[in-house]
Amino acid sequence: MRNGSVLFGLFFIGHSCSVLLAAPTRASNNFDVESTHAEQWDSNGKRTLQADDSERTLAEERSMTQALLPAAEAFGKTKLPETTVPRASLGSKLNPMTWLKRIWYKLRLWNARFRLAKLKVRTSGENSIDRATLEGLTPLYLKKLKNEIFRYSSSVPRDKVQIEDEYDTFVTKYFRHFDGLFKEKPVTKMGKWDKLVRAMTRTGQLAMRAMLRKVGRTVDKGYSNEKLISLDVSPLLYMRLLVKRGVFTDVEHNKAKIDRLKNYVKAYKEHVMVSQPGG
């Protein structure tokens, strides 16, 4: 009897444990089963459970993928702004190249200023500009000098207007000397230049003759106008050279030489009048 009671107790305990262990399993199974159903409502307004259609689900996923794919590709092609890498520039005060450039500009500016000051002293007296012109001073030389000062100055020169006015005045007076050259019967008006030569010192006369010989050697080589301009051959000395050679005493037989001089004067003037950067 006692043994029967013990067996009955063990049976009861084991059965209870099996029930407790089986309960979560059934609940989870029920949850899994219900999770595969989707809530829907019929035409009568009653809620029904319908199993998910696997093919419909895959179709929806494919449609979503196709809808998102263009946006993803567009995002992938979008270029993000690159981070700017700071680097030394020519304008940086710490760049040694900037200092070298500044020193070079200063030296060029000082040289141009020195030549301008020397020229002003040279052309300060009476008839001094005409005398300097006979010695080889040309508008192109002044133009280059003016442009150097403007280019190598760190700011607008304080005497910019004065330099421009003096340059324009010289150019205007210089080309007036050729007004008679373009008449039907060319006139050189070299009488006043001869007076200036006679008033020169012996050294000045020798220098002017040497300059005429140099111009003669260059012209006789048959260079083009562009080449003569690049060498800055003085048009006035060119004309004086032809006068010394007697070209204007017989215009009919020397028409080609006179026409060549005319063409050079025109080309030279056009070159001078063309504006340049910094000028």
From Swiss-Prot:
Subcellular compartments: Secreted; Host nucleus
Domain notes: The RxLR-dEER motif acts to carry the protein into the host cell cytoplasm through binding to cell surface phosphatidylinositol-3-phosphate.
Domain of life according to the entry: Eukaryota
Signal peptide, first to last residue: 1-22
Keywords associated with the record: Host nucleus, Secreted, Signal, Virulence
Function: Secreted effector that completely suppresses the host cell death induced by cell death-inducing proteins.
The keyword Signal belongs to this UniProt entry's keyword annotation: yes
Primary location class: secreted
Protein name: Secreted RxLR effector protein 152
Coiled coil in keyword set: no
Family: Belongs to the RxLR effector family.
One annotated Gene Ontology cellular component of this protein: extracellular region
Organism of provenance: Plasmopara viticola
Motif RxLR-dEER per record, residues: 47-62
